[in-house]
Amino acid sequence: AVDFDKQCVPTADPGPCKGFMPMWWYNIFTSQCEEFIYGGCQGNDNRYRTKEECDKTCAEASATWDVNA
């Protein structure tokens, strides 16, 4: 099961490292997966290698997520 609050709600967090890794994150305000640059360490769980993985995890789960829960 998807932990929507942990995997899809936080904003993109590139972390403190200086790598250059294009990743995807789910933006709850636009209900879209968006690209960002990940530094390679730390960050949060709202980070996906592909848009498809992001969509599958968060876009589908957002349909049943209750903002007031």
Curated annotation (Swiss-Prot):
GO terms for molecular function: serine-type endopeptidase inhibitor activity. It is found in: Secreted. Residues 8-58 form the BPTI/Kunitz inhibitor domain. One of its GO terms (cellular component) is extracellular space. The record marks 18-19 as: Reactive bond. SUPFAM superfamilies: BPTI-like (SSF57362). Keywords: Disulfide bond, Protease inhibitor, Secreted, Serine protease inhibitor. Pfam families: Kunitz_BPTI (PF00014). GO terms for biological process: envenomation resulting in negative regulation of voltage-gated potassium channel activity in another organism. It comes from the Eukaryota. Its main location: secreted. Disulfide bonds join 8-58, 17-41, 33-54. Serine protease inhibitor. This is Protease inhibitor carrapatin. The lineage of its organism: Eukaryota, Metazoa, Ecdysozoa, Arthropoda, Chelicerata.
